[in-house]
Amino acid sequence: FAGSLLEFDQVKEQIAGYTKTVVGGERSRSLVPTKDLLEIVTRLQETSEARQYLEIGSGLEFGPDQDFRELLQRALLGGLLRGEELFAVRELLRAARFNRTELGRQVEVPMLTGISENLPELSDLERVISGAISPAGEVLDNASPVLHNLRQEVRQAQNRLNEIMERNLRRLQRAEVVQEPLITQRNGRMVLLIKSEMR
């Protein structure tokens, strides 16, 4: 087989080293030689356009360097995605939108423009995720009205508790009962440090 004479496996491995994503590396390693003239011409034209596109200083965005297949399969089956996973999906959508827009402006690379037109337009989903998930993967207050109200109630209750603890601390300080003038937490509870002889 001519592929072994050309050290095709080593060539594929070298190409994979230049890819930006896990999936891109896998696709590079799975390349097989072809005798189909139309496919050869098409791939050469795509490669030529990609080179031309990069030479004019433009670039592409790839989003997070992770394999989204398992994550998307889980979502398709109705599974839950963690906050950081949702934000990674948002970054992938943002990159796809950028590439679609950027390549759509380039008349010199019609094949790449055609490929970019196959990227789905999901800016509404991107916007929803952006409004609900922080870059750290935390669910934002405005993810839903119910969550917003619940978190507001929790903050108000926490503020009331802090005020009560501070009043008690001042009162016990005047009575010289506290060991240190601070409020700490033990086992998730707010506590005042009382002098051992006063317990």
List where the protein language model places each region.
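Conserved amphipathic alpha-helical "coupling/scaffold" segments
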Residues: 1-154
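Extended, Lys/Arg-enriched charged tracts that mediate electrostatic binding to polyanionic substrates
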Residues: 148-199
